[in-house]
Swiss-Prot record:
Function summary: Catalyzes the cyclization of GTP to (8S)-3',8-cyclo-7,8-dihydroguanosine 5'-triphosphate.
Residues that bind [4Fe-4S] cluster 1: 24, 28, 31
Residues annotated for S-adenosyl-L-methionine binding in this entry: 30, 72, 123, 194
Keyword check for Metal-binding: yes
GO molecular function, one term: metal ion binding
Lineage: Bacteria, Pseudomonadati, Pseudomonadota, Gammaproteobacteria, Enterobacterales
InterPro entries associated with the record: Aldolase_TIM (IPR013785), Elp3/MiaA/NifB-like_rSAM (IPR006638), MoaA (IPR013483), MoaA_NifB_PqqE_Fe-S-bd_CS (IPR000385), MoaA_twitch (IPR010505), MoCo_biosynth_MoaA/MoaC (IPR050105), rSAM (IPR007197)
Protein name listed in UniProt: GTP 3',8-cyclase
Essential cofactor(s): [4Fe-4S] cluster
Domain of life: Bacteria
Cofactor binding annotation: Binds 2 [4Fe-4S] clusters. Binds 1 [4Fe-4S] cluster coordinated with 3 cysteines and an exchangeable S-adenosyl-L-methionine and 1 [4Fe-4S] cluster coordinated with 3 cysteines and the GTP-derived substrate.
Amino acid sequence: MASQLTDAFARKFYYLRLSITDVCNFRCTYCLPDGYKPSGVTNKGFLTVDEIRRVTRAFASLGTEKVRLTGGEPSLRRDFTDIIAAVRENDAIRQIAVTTNGYRLERDVANWRDAGLTGINVSVDSLDARQFHAITGQDKFNQVMAGIDAAFEAGFEKVKVNTVLMRDVNHHQLDTFLNWIQHRPIQLRFIELMETGEGSELFRKHHISGQVLRDELLRRGWIHQLRQRSDGPAQVFCHPDYAGEIGLIMPYEKDFCATCNRLRVSSIGKLYLCLFGEGGVNLRDLLEDDTQQQALEARISVALREKKQTHFLHQNNTGITQNLSYIGG
């Protein structure tokens, strides 16, 4: 195995977020309010199963322990179960997770688990069906809730739920969310609304700091948990009276980037060192054949030397991220 991926600031990278499509069937207000529109940036289409196998094999050789499949909506790919199985072939990958809108969860989650999926994140921005419809553009609240139940029935011990925190939309609904997770092993993760190139107006209207929720959780006796090396960026809190947990993802907080442990590859095979970086490094020409793995690993390692110490969101610089469906949020 090659040496562990480490950048110029001594950060080690154990976690790959791999987008497999930028297509999504939801129209979330903070991501794709006008729905998915093909970009026309490639004539080769999205990464194939073989290309996904090769890129994850290279990252595993460089010390990656966790792969999260993202989109767009990953489950819209007809070969999604085959993709999970391809990643699972590598024993060095200890965790394979997916971030999904839950649209196909009830129908397919048992098959995903059988293929090797170990973790699920479901996007749920409101527990009110009408508000859920207003945010997502889809009247699928009950279907998504049934999907979460199906995940537990399929054998997942915990489900993570992602909730984008928005002022005057859901920031005042903490008690409703807490009641929901009191007897369910759900890690509910509130994610601060992030500014993107297409979402500046929405950001100015609805952004609120997660500090507000953190202060309230601590006041109520919630306890901050230690972070593991392949965990995502959430600050996780638990409470003895709750089966569930609360996570807070606050990218505008000081030192947020100090614990960065993840890299991103887009659905067309570009490596991104940061969600809000300025550009990507093409890997696809080195995904055509198994004999290219050494060159692929070298390109990844060299690219990492250019990773910046921090993002520049505080300067309203969102890089190339026009919306979060492009490189998987």
